[in-house]
Amino acid sequence: MTSKISTTYEEEGRQSKIQPRAFVITRSGPSSKSSSFSARQSYASSRQSITPGVYQQLSSSGITDFRGTREKEKREMQNLNERLASYIEKVHFLDAQVKKLEAENEALRNRKSESLQPIRDAYENELAQARKVIDELSSTKGVSEAKVAGLQDEIASLRELIVTYENQSKDYRKKIESLGNQIGEYEGELHTLRIRCGSLEDENAKVRELLDKIQEQNRRLRADLDTETAAHIEADCLAQTKTEEAEFYKDLLDQLELLKPEPIQIKGMDYAEFWKSELSKCVREIQSAYDEKIDMIQQDTEAKYSAQLNSLRSGNVKDGMQLQHVQEEVKKLRTQAGEKNAMYAELAAKFASLQAERDSIGRQCSELERELEELRIKYNQDIGDLSNELSAVLAQLQILTDAKITMELEIACYRKLLEGEESRVGLRSLVEQAIGVQGRGTASLKDTIQQSTSSGSMTIQRSSKGPIAFNSVDQSGSNIVIENTTSGARAKTQSLRGWRIDKTVAGRVAASIQLKDYEIPPNTKYTIWAKGAKDRATADNEQIADIFSLGVGSCTWTIVDEAGNEKATLIAKFSG
């Protein structure tokens, strides 16, 4: 209260009209026999109000009530006296304070004003240095923007090159797929030909088995024919032998005719005639028996030989026809087998060439894929490095922009302070800051810097897809305010569990603030403070972000729920 009165007197420059007063206060305890002035006055008035004869009318109970009333009145008077004494003490204290303040005010009025030229020069030097820093930051910003533009162009060219390589890779994959399909068709045709060749080989094996059977049968027939021929030759030899034997006997008979002796007469018998007749008889018997035997053998042999020859002739004709047919079939099958073998060899050569071409294309594709993967890894690394460099440049640019805005705010603040140097409070703050005294001027300067605005303007566009929406964003980057816009019958509480707020600058997320688990009631605001603006939260609907400053300048703020859906958006565009 004293400081308020002093400030009012200093600002208005008028003297106090309250004059010193003298009071004499006499206090007495409750048990004292002598009372204060007020007590005596009350007692006197009470005593004067009693008329004669009243005491006779009072009973013992009336006297007791009267005494209680008197004690009560005494206590009330004592309380009033104490309150009056405390009030008088306060008045004395305030009068003394007013005198002191009047003396200080008079001393300040009589005090000669000091020269502010050193302070003005110091602030002008600081302003010149600030302008120089701003110019340097502007040039650095231009270089950084040019570098960022070059990096973006390079990233765009690298992306186009990656797209070209990906298109080439797709073309190679399509070509490989078509070649694989063609190879599959060739393999299917080759498999069909192999099956057909296998069936032809099976038929050829069956024909060979049939030919082997026919040849075996021919061999058996030849063996039988050889046997019959040998028997026929043996019979011919036997007949020749018998013929020679007959010739021998005939010659022998002829010789006997030549060596015929003279007839011998025995007892009147002619032995020559006897011998001749007997011998002729024997020869005729032998000859007849031999002829019969020869005829029988010859007939049997001729019949058997004729039958065998007939069977051989018929079998040879049949076998010859079958053999000729089989030979023709074998020749035809050999021709077909030769053609199939040639076709198979041609297909095998073609398949080998296609397989070699496929392997070559596969190796080329593997090499191209490896090169493409290396290029992709390299380009991804380059993109990552460029992105990191771009992020660093953007962060540095954001820092420079924040520093520029801060310098602009400080310059505006200093300009206002210099323009308002007639204000005694402003002069006192500047003097205290110049001589290194930490007082009310420093806090006032700090508050003025934080609450001042730059010479630019900020355009804000808001949009929301639910009950939660942006309410405001502080231009100095100290806080963000969101609110639950529901009310009335549609009012509902919204939980912020898993929600976050993202700040996007130049298409990249520059900062992300994770909201705490809090339920916003309807028509209630929720404030997120920067760490540099507020140390700790003073209410449940406040949160301190783990960021020193939320930043200034053009940016986009987005509220994202736990599922990654955008619930509200605020676009801030700063111009100035």
From Swiss-Prot:
Region (Head): 2-75
Low complexity bias (residue ranges): 28-49
Region entry Disordered, spans: 1-51
Keywords assigned: Coiled coil, Cytoplasm, Intermediate filament
Subcellular location: Cytoplasm
Cellular component aspect of the GO annotation: cytoplasm; intermediate filament; nuclear envelope; nuclear lamina
Domain LTD residues, every copy: 456-574
Annotated region (Coil 2), positions in chain: 279-425
Coil 1B, as annotated region: 123-260
Domain IF rod: 73-425
Domain of life assignment: Eukaryota
Pfam families, alphabetized: Filament
This protein's record includes keyword Cytoplasm: yes
SMART domains recorded: Filament (SM01391)
A GO molecular function held by the record: structural constituent of cytoskeleton
Renumbered residue ranges of the record's region Linker 1: 109-122
Tail as annotated region, ranges: 426-576
Location of the region described as Linker 2 in the Swiss-Prot/TrEMBL record: 261-278
Family: Belongs to the intermediate filament family.
Protein name listed in UniProt: Non-neuronal cytoplasmic intermediate filament protein
